[in-house]
Amino acid sequence: MSVLSDADVRQYLAKGEIQIEPFEESSLTPNGYDVSIEEVLVPSTRQKATGGVAQIPPTTRFVVSTRERVRLGRHVAGQIWLRTTWARRGVIASFGMIDAGFSGTLTFGAFNASGDPIEIPIGDRFAQIAFLTLDSPASETYDQRSGTYQDQKGVTLGRP
């Protein structure tokens, strides 16, 4: 496996092995792509923000969905990283891999570990995807194996 550079990502986009909608050149990084916030949900209060600014109380769990819809081919996976801007404000988040064959918006679980409220503007960049090439194509892609969250849109909480 190797991480794709910005030039590689452009080539994979042109070939259709990676799709990002909407795609913004300014979100492309030297080794990935920054995804932005479409929706924030605070499950404990059922507070949902789809515009303006989400207010996250101290020591509170929240869930973020991306504006971008991502689709990966058989040869590509994605690794998600929290932007350090948020980590420096006290946000902790848990991410997994984006499997080859996945299609949909992304949902992230996060936690305001600080003792202060945090404001999260809808539309701000929240995480980066580092795209990885697989040494060989996946024999079964995400949609063929489980596909639990295939084609999800918006905040999608855990499914059994």
Where on the chain are the PLM-derived regions?
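DUTPase catalytic domain/fold
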Residues: 1-160
